[in-house]
């Protein structure tokens, strides 16, 4: 079978190769999935560069998300139930950028046939992260503000549409002026341009406080995918008992702030990783989440825009497009027909 692999961590364009390897065999509790499609997410690129939460054990195949059909089971009730079913594959170990992937049966979930392959392939990482962070963890109330960095990303756009649907307001931080009107057209309540090389964090802090609270006391809810100066400024904008979820490190720079910031406001900074969250919830919760996400994707609230589709043999072109800031939408690896 064909699989994209890397022998050592590094720049994706340089280290990724499409190779012919043996088809894996599922063990007890695992299933063999014939992959149909899988996206290129920022977390995949961080994994390839050696910057992800879980270090890569090279040689290895990347790919944490995708859709496929269960072709074989190593044994177990779930494996038997899912045979020949189309499933979402949330592969915490990576391995989806291949013709076939072996995963624990607990990491595949049947998906509705009403969703296209493209939407099914991008079903979990962004849509589930957007929903779980705002509705299950932070539980942002109607009328309250949520500050988010990386607002121009695919996930950031979902957050904006989700805010419009469920009633919370969004303060959106982007790096380029060209993104402002586009996000406003999606329903963003406020868009702020911040580039750490050009703008002062104090100005961003003041704008957040001024916009999100009448008294300038600070914002109650925030999510950060960037870290560095932007994420640090958001922390310093939190109000009394404010909460920020850190779910990404796109800048590869650490958060920097005085503990006094948290002490004086009793605010909190918490980490969020979807894979760990999903590992800790029950199958009924997962199935309920799938039904909810399916409706929201079908309604266009949590749908993913596909910018380009490539094959496994076009992996260099695919990762180049995925890292091109002018490309609006996801790059998808289409592996097989349903």
PLM region descriptions:
Residues 216, 294-295, 301-308, 316-338:
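C-terminal capping/lid region of NAD(P)-dependent oxidoreductase domains
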Residues 127-128, 150-157, 228:
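Glycine-rich NAD(P) Rossmann-fold beta1-alpha1 loop
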Residues 229-301, 334-338:
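Glycine-rich phosphate-binding loop and adjacent beta-alpha segment
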Residues 22-39, 51-95:
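Glycine-rich beta-strand-centered segment in the early N-terminal region that forms part
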Residues 87-150:
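NAD(P)H dinucleotide-binding glycine-rich loop of Rossmann-like/cofactor-binding domains
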Residues 96-98, 175-182, 254-259:
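Short, glycine/polar-rich helix-capping loops at beta-to-alpha or helix-loop-helix junctions
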Residues 80-82, 140, 238:
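Short, well-ordered loop/turn sites that connect or cap secondary structure elements
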Residues 164-230, 284:
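Adenosine-nucleotide cofactor-binding segment
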